[in-house]
């Protein structure tokens, strides 16, 4: 059971607001490494044990107190201490997530802002998660927005930040990476080390650690995660949860709550909402960008491709997370499948009757043939990979289209215990990898594009077969 403990004093900010008219409208502030999120503080109420305050507990003896009579004084002390005992509220967020499972994003957003006030903020990446800001605006409640400026964002994203601030009349609170850490990384490995040894180290310096500092000043945060963004890693995101990775203002495990108002919303519905509400959007979207991150690690995707294919495209599908939402990555999915531990757990893909299924021996024999009578096109795939799943329809269509043409269309499952073989012998870099074995040639040619529609694959075949 996921629970969060919220400790509140009997002297609450709500009481002060209603009785004395003190405005609790949140202050927009810089939440850099030198200053955390501004908070409204309520002066602590000190205990008065002098006996001069009137006690709510009547003395046991109505006669005047004497020097030797300590019972009334003890009763007074107990009563006054009792007045200041803090109330501990235990929230079951698993149960709350169930109650809100079918709620609208607006209802979830309103609940989050109502519950946490100035202690919650929206994490804004500069993409379609601007929908979160629109939902917060529609609640009529004050809200805060922060963003991670990695120093490597697209110029279009910076201009978009400015447009959002002007549209909503807000100030986005930017978090920056530690300059010493960035200098150390760049001087030791260069500006583009992530192309060589993966993006995790760079993301840790430029994104994860700045985020950790920002969240230390909050009790909750709001993200734009959706289940359909990455079926392999985000398919079980709840609408609200105790953050399994980061700590909040009070410190310790369970001190931060994570809200995901659009977890159950599909990407198309988000865009319909943005168009209907005439919300400003990042101009990169019009250029084919869907998932937007840092400039060196983001590119446009083509029709039919999954949106996350535009991020860290040189890495395996299972690596397409930067670490900000590590707690939502399914721990037992990809790793087990890659190691061949759960082959039967995922249904196979590419099921056209005109498609040849190759075994390890079959593809080894195909590689040995130096004078093939017909060309082959083979996809190296893993059925759990969302990018392989995304091209299933087009590849099956290709097999049906080429049936009887003299071109063989085949598949080879290259995960699990076949992965190392595929890396060494078949040029496997990430899933899916497509190879063409030309006629009268033993060396396969790797398809270089991520455009996997029927027309593009057919055109490539005609050029190299």
From Swiss-Prot:
Keyword Lipoprotein recorded: no
Cofactor info, note text: Binds 1 [4Fe-4S] cluster.
The protein's Enzyme Commission number: 1.8.4.9
Distribution of this protein across tissues and organs: Leaves, roots and stem.
Activity regulation statement: Stimulated by sodium sulfate > ammonium sulfate and is sensitive to inactivation by 5'AMP.
Organelle transit peptide residues: 1-53
Keyword Plastid listed: yes
GO function terms (MF aspect): 4 iron, 4 sulfur cluster binding; adenylyl-sulfate reductase (glutathione) activity; adenylyl-sulfate reductase activity; metal ion binding; phosphoadenylyl-sulfate reductase (thioredoxin) activity
Cysteines engaged in disulfide bonds, as pairs: 385-388
Domain Thioredoxin: 344-465
Region (Reductase domain): 73-327
A GO-annotated cellular component: chloroplast
Cross-referenced Pfam families: PAPS_reduct (PF01507), Thioredoxin (PF00085)
Record-level GO BP terms: cysteine biosynthetic process; sulfate assimilation; sulfate assimilation, phosphoadenylyl sulfate reduction by phosphoadenylyl-sulfate reductase (thioredoxin)
pH effect on activity, per entry: Optimum pH is 8.5.
Essential cofactor(s): [4Fe-4S] cluster
Entry note about domains: The C-terminal domain may function as glutaredoxin and mediates the interaction of the enzyme with glutathione (GSH). Active in GSH-dependent reduction of hydroxyethyldisulfide, cystine, dehydroascorbate, insulin disulfides and ribonucleotide reductase.
Family: Belongs to the APS reductase family.
NCBIfam families given in the database record: APS_reduc, PRK02090.1
Name under which the protein is recorded: 5'-adenylylsulfate reductase 1, chloroplastic
Taxonomic path: Eukaryota, Viridiplantae, Streptophyta, Embryophyta, Tracheophyta
Gene encoding the protein: APR1
């Amino acid at each position: 059971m996921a629970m969060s403990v919220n400790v509140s004093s009997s002297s609450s900010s709500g009481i002060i607001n209603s009785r004395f008219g003190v405005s609790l409208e949140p202050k927009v502030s810089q939440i850099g490494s030198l200053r955390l999120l501004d908070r409204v503080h309520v002066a602590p109420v000190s205990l008065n044990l002098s006996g001069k305050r009137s006690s709510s507990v009547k003395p046991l003896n109505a006669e005047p107190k004497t020097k030797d009579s300590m019972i009334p004084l003890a009763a007074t002390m107990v009563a006054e201490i009792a007045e200041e005992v803090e109330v501990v509220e235990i929230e079951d967020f698993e149960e709350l997530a169930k109650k809100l499972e079918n709620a609208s994003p607006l209802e979830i957003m309103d609940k989050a802002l109502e519950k946490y006030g100035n202690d919650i903020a929206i994490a804004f990446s500069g993409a379609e998660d601007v929908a979160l800001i629109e939902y917060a605006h529609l609640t009529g409640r004050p809200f805060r927005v922060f963003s991670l400026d990695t120093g490597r964002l697209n110029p279009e994203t910076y201009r978009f930040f400015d447009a959002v601030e002007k549209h909503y009349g807000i100030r986005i609170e930017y978090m920056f990476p530690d300059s010493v850490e960035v200098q150390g990384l760049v001087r030791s490995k260069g500006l583009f080390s992530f192309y060589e040894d993966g993006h995790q180290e760079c993301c840790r310096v430029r994104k994860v650690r700045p985020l950790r500092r920002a969240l230390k000043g909050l009790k909750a945060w709001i993200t734009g995660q959706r289940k359909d963004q990455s079926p392999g890693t985000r398919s079980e995101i709840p609408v609200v949860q105790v953050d399994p990775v980061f700590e909040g203002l009070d410190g310790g495990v369970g001190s931060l709550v994570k809200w995901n108002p659009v977890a159950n919303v599909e990407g198309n519905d988000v865009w319909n909402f943005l168009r209907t509400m005439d919300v400003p959007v990042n101009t990169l979207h019009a250029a084919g960008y869907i998932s937007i991150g840092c400039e060196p690690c983001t590119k446009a995707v083509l029709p039919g491709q999954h949106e996350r294919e535009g991020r860290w495209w040189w890495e395996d599908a299972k690596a397409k997370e930067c670490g900000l939402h590590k707690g939502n990555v399914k721990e037992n999915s990809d790793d087990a499948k890659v190691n061949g531990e759960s082959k039967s757990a995922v249904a196979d893909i590419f099921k056209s009757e005109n498609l040849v299924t190759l075994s390890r021996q079959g593809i080894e024999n195909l590689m040995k043939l130096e004078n093939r009578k017909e060309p082959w096109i083979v996809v190296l795939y893993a059925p759990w990979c969302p990018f392989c799943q995304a091209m299933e329809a087009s590849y099956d269509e290709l097999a049906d289209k080429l049936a009887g043409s003299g071109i063989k269309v085949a598949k080879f499952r290259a995960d699990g215990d076949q992965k190392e073989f595929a890396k060494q012998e078949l040029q496997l870099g990430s899933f899916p990898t497509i190879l063409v074995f030309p006629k009268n040639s033993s060396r396969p040619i790797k398809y270089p594009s991520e455009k996997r529609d029927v027309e593009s694959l057919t055109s490539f075949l005609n050029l190299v077969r």
